[in-house]
Structures are given as C-alpha cells and as structure tokens.
C-alpha cells in the first residue's frame, strides 16, 4: 500500500517537473523561435539577439550613452536621445522590425494605418503581456491599466461613471480651489523674493491634491506619504523590469526586490487606512453609500459582490485600482503641465497669446468656468503641441492573444507589438519638416489624424479613461497660472528629458515667476 502511494507521488512529481520544464522551454525557446520564423517569412527581421539577453544590453548601452549628457540648448529633437535604438534600427530595417527583450520578441511598428487598425479593431484579442504585468505587479498591480479581457471590461465599466457627464464637470470646483491656493502661496513666496520655482514639483503636488480630493475624498497632505512611496516604488520597478526576461529573477532576494517588497507593503498599508476610513463612515450611519467618487464606486461594487458571494472585486483589486488612478491621475497630468509651462516660458509670443485669450474669455480677474473652457482654442493648441512633443509615454505596447491580421501583415499569437509614440509624434513624414519645433498652429490650420498620427492617450476602446479629466484639469490650471504670472526660463534650467516609465525632466523645470498686476 505504502509502495503504491510512493509510486503515485513519484509519478505526480515527475509529471509536474516535466510539465514545468516543457512550459519553460516553450516560453523561452519554442514560442519565440516560432514567432521569429513566421515574421522572417514575411520579411520582418531585426538586430541579431544574444542568448538570454536578446538586445537588452545593446539598448541599455545606447540609451545610457545618449542620455548621459544634457542637451546643449532647449530643443525638441529628442527621439535620438530617448529612443536611440529605434533611430538606429529603423534606418537599417525599416518601419517594421523585431527587437528582442531577452527571449521575448517585440515588433516595432510605426505604420499609422496598421496602428489604427490594431487599436480600433483588435482590442478584444490584444492587451498587456505577461511580462508587462509582472513589471508593474508591485507598482499598480492588476488595475485597469494592466487588466485584459473580461477583467478589463468589468473594471472599465465600473470606473467609467467617475469620468463622464455632470460628475466630470463637478470636479472643476476642486480644481479651481486647489489651483487658487497654489497661486496664493506662489504670490507670497515670490513677494518674499523667491521668484525661481521648480514648477514640476509644484505641479506634482497640485495634481496629487486634485486627484486625492476628486477621486478619493482625501487631500494631498493626508496622502503625502503615499505619493512619496509611490514615486520611489515607480523608479524601483522601472529599474527592476530590465531583469524580468531572466527566468526567476523576480524571486531573487536582490536589493531592488527587497526594497520593492517593503515599499509595496507600506503603500498598501496607507491605502487600507484610506479605504477603511471611507467604509467606517458608511458603517457608522453617516452615509447610506460609500459616495459617488471613484473610491465610493469601487467600494459599492465590492459590497454588491460580497452579497452575491462573488470575490472577484476583493480588497486587493480595490487597492490596485487606487494605485493605478493615484499614479495615472496625477503623474501624467503633472508632466503635461510641467512640459507645457516650459514651452510657454520659452515661447513668450505664445504665452502672451494664450494670456490674452484667457482674459478675453474669463475677464482679467475671473476664475475659469468649465462651460467656457472650449473657447480656449489657443490654449488647446498649445496643450496638444506639448503632448505631441513630450507625450507621457514613449511607447504603447500590445500583445496579440491570438493570430491576427494587420493589413498585409500576419501577427502570430504571443507577439508583442510596440508602438513608438514619441517617434510617430516627431516624424517629419507625418508632421512636416518642422516636426521637432514648437508650432501649436499645426493643430489649428489643418485637421490632425487623432488615433493614428497623434496618440498621447492611445486610441480605440482601450484609450485613456481619464483623458477628458486630464485635459479639463490642465486647461483650468494653466489658464489660472498664466493669468496671474508671467514666466520665463531660469538660467539654472538644464534641458535633459529622461524616461522613467514616463518622460520626465531630469533636473526639474526651473522658471522665474513674475506676478502680473490685476
């Protein structure tokens, strides 16, 4: 009897080992080779990969070299700085080529018609890859940004009401209040002689305060520790992703992995405090629901699922959504505001043009009204041009979950497609000879191909759920600041864009503020 049990256990053990071995070989060898063969048959090649590391070492060396020096002046020809591997290999292999992230093949695609087809028509059979999900697992988890399939549909449906209709307009009051407080503080600081301001830091604080108040019923001061931890966690996760292509790397007790684990634990502890505080209000009878902001909608749904014995929307998912929107809701908008302020400070003619428009629409001392934001056409052009030159992300990734057809190209299941947004936004073929110059008028004189040439918020059903929120917020903040201050570039500003998940100014953006007479 005992011998039979031992034999059975041995069979199970050996079968499991063989299965794991086969899956590993399939994942890291058989599937990549199959994809490589299919793409080569279509004439799509790329730089020769090294065993295990693929092209990672080459990319890392090129990026390190190109970004090691600051720009010698303020210019916007930054594709070669941030995506030097794309520049080199697109010249050699054309508009389609394969790059290897370890043993993971990635198709770099810049043909805008094919990109539109992918984003508009194939969203149901494409999404985030396993490697992407692992890379952000400890940062934003499996929230909306990283979800796929039915999970994505459910989460999108759940969050959508917080970003539409009258509820969206209702957030304007908080945006105006938070911005007015910033103006008061800056006026006081400038009045005391501190007229140089690192505007990036101010924009991050401001957008963090706004997203806290509008989506989570909190404030930046309460969430200050959370935002600080999230910022460090973002950097550490970005640094750790370069090792993901090596099997088992995420389990190693490395310095990065230990620090990531500790930061994640602290972030989730702080989130639980915010969540529990909201739940306590409802349980103590202060409110019949958890509220109608994003956190309230998530908690209300969690209660429904609990009553239906459905555990899909558990506490971990709520925390993942909170991390996703804390990050996406303030980081990308803060960077949009930072780069736009830099561009306006460096282009006084456009700064004055926008200022005159704001005064014409709102009056010299009037506060922005959400119903009149559409009249700020010059400001809209400037914001679009800022998003074109400095999009929040340099790349837009998608993985094919089944074989699909893009034009004349067959995309095999398991192939990741990487869309170099920055390169598309700076393409002279698409935007003209002045593609690397600041020219907001390009968004007024002729229509632009949103969804193909211009994709700062992605496109199709999986576009950014908060883009209207972000644009409304940006217009309110910029309209307020430009009506109260004149800003010029400080001599201490060093132009050095870098990529840490998003495009950031390496040393911040220092501007000189001068209060305007009302």
Swiss-Prot record:
Q: Which GO terms fall under molecular function for this chain's record?
A: heme binding; iron ion binding; monooxygenase activity; oxidoreductase activity, acting on paired donors, with incorporation or reduction of molecular oxygen
Q: What induces it?
A: By trans-zeatin and isopentenyladenine in roots. Down-regulated by auxin and abscisic acid in roots.
Main location per the UniProt record: membrane
| Record-annotated membrane-spanning stretches | 1-21
Q: Which UniProt keywords apply?
A: Heme, Iron, Membrane, Metal-binding, Monooxygenase, NADP, Oxidoreductase, Transmembrane, Transmembrane helix
Which cofactors, if any, are listed as required? heme
A biological process (GO) annotation for this entry?
trans-zeatin biosynthetic process
Q: Where in the cell is it found?
A: Membrane
Membrane topology for this entry?
Answer: Single-pass membrane protein
What the entry lists under InterPro entries is as follows: Cyt_P450, Cyt_P450_E_grp-I, Cyt_P450_sf, Cytochrome_P450_Monooxygen
Name the reaction it catalyses.
N(6)-(dimethylallyl)adenosine 5'-phosphate + NADPH + O2 + H(+) = 9-ribosyl-trans-zeatin 5'-phosphate + NADP(+) + H2O; N(6)-(dimethylallyl)adenosine 5'-diphosphate + NADPH + O2 + H(+) = 9-ribosyl-trans-zeatin 5'-diphosphate + NADP(+) + H2O; N(6)-(dimethylallyl)adenosine 5'-triphosphate + NADPH + O2 + H(+) = 9-ribosyl-trans-zeatin 5'-triphosphate + NADP(+) + H2O
Quote the cellular component terms of the Gene Ontology held in the record: membrane; secretory vesicle
Enzyme Commission number, as recorded = 1.14.13.-
User: Which major enzyme category is it?
Assistant: oxidoreductase
Q: List the disulfide bonds.
A: none
Give tissue specificity per the record: Expressed in roots and flowers.
Binding-site residues, heme: 464
Family annotation (SUPFAM superfamilies): Cytochrome P450 (SSF48264)
Q: What family does the Swiss-Prot or TrEMBL record give for this protein?
A: Belongs to the cytochrome P450 family.
The free-text function statement in the UniProt record for this protein reads: Cytokinin hydroxylase that catalyzes the biosynthesis of trans-zeatin via the isopentenyladenine riboside 5'-monophosphate (iPRMP)-dependent pathway. Can use isopentenyladenosine-5'-monophosphate, isopentenyladenosine-5'-diphosphate and isopentenyladenosine-5'-triphosphate as substrate.
Q: What is this protein called?
A: Cytokinin hydroxylase
This chain is encoded by the gene named CYP735A1
């Amino acid at each position: 009897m005992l011998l039979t049990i031992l034999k059975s256990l041995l069979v199970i053990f050996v079968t499991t080992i063989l299965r794991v071995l086969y899956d590993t070989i399939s994942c890291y060898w058989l599937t990549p080779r199959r994809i490589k063969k299919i793409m080569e048959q279509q004439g799509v090649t790329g730089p020769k990969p090294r065993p295990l590391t693929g092209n990672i070492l080459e990319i890392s060396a090129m990026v390190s070299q190109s970004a090691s020096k600051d720009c010698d002046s303020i210019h916007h020809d930054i594709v070669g700085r941030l995506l030097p591997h794309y520049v080199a290999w697109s010249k050699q292999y054309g508009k389609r080529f394969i790059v290897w992230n370890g043993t993971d093949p990635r198709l770099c695609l810049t043909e805008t018609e094919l990109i539109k087809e992918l984003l508009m028509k194939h969203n149901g059979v494409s999404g985030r890859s396993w490697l992407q999900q692992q890379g952000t697992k400890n940062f934003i988890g499996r929230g909306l940004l990283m979800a796929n399939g039915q999970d994505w549909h459910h989460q999108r449906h759940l969050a959508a009401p917080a970003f539409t209709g009258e509820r969206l307009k209702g957030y304007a009051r908080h945006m105006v209040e938070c911005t007015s407080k910033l103006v008061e503080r800056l006026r006081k600081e400038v009045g005391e002689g501190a007229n140089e301001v690192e505007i990036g830091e101010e924009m991050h604080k401001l957008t963090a305060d706004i997203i806290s108040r509008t989506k989570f019923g909190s404030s930046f001061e309460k969430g200050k520790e959370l935002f600080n931890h999230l910022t460090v966690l973002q950097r550490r996760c970005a640094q750790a992703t370069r090792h993901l292509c090596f099997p088992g790397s995420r389990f190693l007790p490395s310095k990065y992995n230990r620090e990531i684990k500790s930061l994640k634990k602290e972030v989730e502890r702080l989130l639980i405090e915010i969540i529990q505080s909201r739940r306590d209000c409802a349980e103590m009878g202060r409110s019949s629901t958890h509220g109608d902001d994003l956190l309230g909608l998530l908690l209300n749904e969690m209660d429904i699922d609990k009553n239906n014995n459905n555990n899909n929307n558990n506490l971990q998912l709520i925390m993942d959504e909170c991390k996703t929107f804390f990050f996406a809701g303030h980081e990308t908008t803060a960077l949009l505001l930072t780069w736009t302020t830099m561009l306006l400070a460096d282009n006084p003619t456009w700064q004055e043009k926008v200022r005159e428009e704001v005064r014409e629409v709102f009056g010299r001392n009037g506060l922005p009204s959400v119903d009149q934001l559409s009249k700020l056409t010059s400001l809209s052009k400037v914001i679009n041009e800022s998003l074109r030159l400095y999009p929040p992300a340099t790349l837009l990734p998608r993985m094919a979950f089944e074989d699909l057809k893009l034009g004349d190209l067959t995309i095999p299941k398991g192939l990741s497609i990487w869309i170099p947004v920055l390169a598309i936004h700076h393409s002279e073929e698409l935007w003209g000879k002045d593609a690397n110059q600041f020219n907001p008028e390009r968004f007024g004189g002729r229509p632009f191909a949103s969804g193909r040439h211009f994709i700062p918020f992605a496109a199709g059903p999986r576009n950014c759920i908060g883009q209207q929120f972000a644009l409304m917020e940006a217009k309110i903040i910029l309209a307020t600041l430009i009506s109260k201050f004149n800003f010029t570039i400080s001599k201490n500003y060093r132009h050095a864009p870098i990529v840490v998940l998003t495009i950031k100014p390496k040393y911040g953006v220092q501007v000189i503020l001068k209060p305007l007479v009302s």
